[in-house]
Amino acid sequence: MGVLGGPSPRLRLYVYDFKEPGGEAERRKLRELLESHGAFRLQYSTYALLAEPEVHARVLRRVVARVDFEEGDSLIVVPMCRRCLRVARWVDAEGVRGLRF
């Protein structure tokens, strides 16, 4: 089975939002936690992490334990299956292209 196959996709997107003003300390904690597990930034509040399901579970447990979410703050974790990756598109000044991980 391929890197991204199986019932538990290894690639997940972590998309977060913290209200303004404030929230910078929690935003920083979350960024550092994600980066310490090998996640890389796609956009300002969006990270991608290619890891085993156990790592994703550990990341989520640590987020809950270490990040203080207040009313209006959120984190969405989105599993990306093979089909999702095939149809996903990145649009920027260079045009439209598929995602590569």
Swiss-Prot record:
Gene: cas2
Function comment: CRISPR (clustered regularly interspaced short palindromic repeat), is an adaptive immune system that provides protection against mobile genetic elements (viruses, transposable elements and conjugative plasmids). CRISPR clusters contain sequences complementary to antecedent mobile elements and target invading nucleic acids. CRISPR clusters are transcribed and processed into CRISPR RNA (crRNA). Functions as a ssRNA-specific endoribonuclease. Involved in the integration of spacer DNA into the CRISPR cassette.
Quaternary organization: Homodimer, forms a heterotetramer with a Cas1 homodimer.
Pfam families assigned: CRISPR_Cas2 (PF09827)
Molecular-function GO term, any one: metal ion binding
SUPFAM superfamilies to which the protein is assigned, alphabetical: TTP0101/SSO1404-like
Highest taxon, organism lineage: Archaea
Keyword Nuclease: yes
Keywords on record: Antiviral defense, Endonuclease, Hydrolase, Magnesium, Metal-binding, Nuclease
Protein source organism: Methanopyrus kandleri (strain AV19 / DSM 6324 / JCM 9639 / NBRC 100938)
Protein name: CRISPR-associated endoribonuclease Cas2
Family statement drawn from the similarity comment of this UniProt entry: Belongs to the CRISPR-associated endoribonuclease Cas2 protein family.
Alphabetized HAMAP family for the sequence: Cas2
